[in-house]
Regions:
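Nucleotidyltransferase catalytic core that binds NTPs
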Residues: 1-169
Length: 169
């Protein structure tokens, strides 16, 4: 199964997050998008974050409100609500949360899946500050989605980078 890892604080989750996840499901080859609620981001001030369990619960509630039924067909397909999964996977990893570590552990726990990292284009400017960024570039496909107000950027060299130019932002 092809799974998009959409990490973030989700402080709070909002229509933009959900809209992007739905768009990626509809317009790429991903089977699922996992909203990876991060307990803390080493590049952000964690003192302004709502409690991690509260953020996780709000994300679950937001996804649960998506339509969960599809019209009857001979070959039913999963709905968006069934293909967007809210995950607390990072809650069970050493802190702070580093994306490379999360991806490595996901691969160890779910070797049958192919993971794609989803990041906003605002992260490209600071990507080389990420711990083990080269490991991520060398081993994972990366979807880069647009962010309002971002300055032009140069893409890092990596295994498989795809800019989602038509994705909502």
């Amino acid at each position: 199964m092809k799974i998009g890892i959409y990490g973030g604080s989700f402080n709070p989750i909002h229509f933009g997050h959900i809209g992007l996840a739905k768009w990626v499901i509809a317009h790429t080859d991903l089977d699922e998008v996992w909203l990876m609620v991060s307990p803390n981001n080493p590049l952000k001030d964690s003192s302004i974050l709502e409690d991690e369990q509260v953020r996780l619960q709000k994300a679950k509630e937001a996804i649960a409100q998506l339509p969960s039924s599809t019209p009857y067909t001979l070959h039913p397909t999963p709905t968006c609500a069934e293909r967007i999964i809210v995950s607390d996977f990072e809650f069970h990893l050493p802190r702070p949360s580093y994306t490379a570590n999360t991806l490595r552990e996901l691969h160890n726990h779910y070797p049958q899946h192919e993971f794609t990292l989803m990041i906003g284009e605002d992260n490209i400017a600071i990507f080389t500050q990420w711990r083990e960024y080269q490991y991520i570039l060398d081993n994972y496909r990366i979807f880069i989605y647009p962010r309002r107000g971002c300055a032009p950027y140069q893409l890092p060299m990596g295994k498989d980078l795809q800019v989602l130019t038509n994705a909502p932002y």
